[in-house]
Amino acid sequence: MSDESDDKTEAPTPHRLEKAREEGQIPRSRELTSLLILLVGVSVIWFGGVSLARRLSGMLSAGLHFDHSIINDPNLILGQIILLIREAMLALLPLISGVVLVALISPVMLGGLVFSGKSLQPKFSKLNPLPGIKRMFSAQTGAELLKAILKTILVGSVTGFFLWHHWPQMMRLMAESPITAMGNAMDLVGLCALLVVLGVIPMVGFDVFFQIFSHLKKLRMSRQDIRDEFKQSEGDPHVKGRIRQMQRAAARRRMMADVPKADVIVNNPTHYSVALQYDENKMSAPKVVAKGAGLVALRIREIGAENNVPTLEAPPLARALYRHAEIGQQIPGQLYAAVAEVLAWVWQLKRWRLAGGQRPVQPTHLPVPEALDFINEKPTHE
């Protein structure tokens, strides 16, 4: 039993995932962020490399141009430096903006947007060096190390192959004008970066899968955890059973309180009792105010006798009413004729009690459709 509760072999429930999300525990892939940043850099160089090269060449020329008129004036020197910095910022603004935007958006692509203050709260347990030492030799750390080694080998191989293949072209840059050389250099850098991106895409895909798998594995639950969560979110089954029992008892008390209002109680002496009420000025059809089987039926009869409610033994009708009529609801239309005969007998019985004479004969052979009777079914004793 203890082994079952200790082994976290079950997938996390939606509630567990949502709770972890609220605590800031979501899958993250640094490799995905790096890839997107690299893509932004490649795009800027590929589509705006010539413009960037020209602006950087202009800055380089301006920085290497010495004007004797400003050498002895510190204010002019400072102004020149500020101008160069501004030109550099404007030249690199597309690249910087793209990198910042990707750095903000890329984490949302995998784990979604989460604002959690719990991850910012200080945890003094992190000051304990033992967990840190354990993490250094964990499988997660080993996987990260292996991934870093493979990434270094892959990027180094792609870059080395590119430099070897384009070495003559790179050497010719020294013979070109600065602006032309800068533009061609940007093209080479963009092509090299594009090859690196294509090379690391499979690794990034594997890393995304690995991070999601590791996240779900870390949130795995034992069967006992799932049972405890069910008790907390849905309620303890024993408590829920007790609540349902109390609700049934309260409903039964309300039902018994309505028995004295009934006009007649129809009985199957062996099992069932159904109390009916009809007010021709307020109701379009008779309704059931109480019904029960077994001990409940016996209690309905006792309350009816204490309040002088007429009773009629009509087993088929009692069974049909018990099965097909609900408490507080009107009786089914198929039973109108049978109940009408019963109510007519009740009206005659009231007149007899007031005026005397010959006692009315109880109706027999009431017209109850066979489809509504269930004579062979055993009742549930409530």
UniProtKB/Swiss-Prot annotation:
GO terms for biological process: bacterial-type flagellum assembly; bacterial-type flagellum-dependent cell motility; chemotaxis; protein secretion by the type III secretion system. Residues 53-73, 116-144, 211-382 are cytoplasmic. The chain crosses the membrane at residues 32-52, 74-94, 95-115, 145-165, 190-210. It is found in: Cell inner membrane. Residues 8-25 have a biased composition (Basic and acidic residues). Keywords: Bacterial flagellum biogenesis, Bacterial flagellum protein export, Cell inner membrane, Cell membrane, Membrane, Protein transport, Transmembrane, Transmembrane helix, Transport. It is a multi-pass membrane protein. GO terms for cellular component: bacterial-type flagellum; bacterial-type flagellum secretion apparatus; plasma membrane; type III protein secretion system complex. Residues 1-25 are annotated as: Disordered. Its main location: membrane. InterPro entries: FlhB, T3SS_substrate_exporter, T3SS_substrate_exporter_C. Residues 1-31, 166-189 are periplasmic. Belongs to the type III secretion exporter family. PANTHER family: FLAGELLAR BIOSYNTHETIC PROTEIN FLHB. Required for formation of the rod structure in the basal body of the flagellar apparatus. Together with FliI and FliH, may constitute the export apparatus of flagellin. This is Flagellar biosynthetic protein FlhB. It comes from Escherichia coli (strain K12). The gene is flhB.
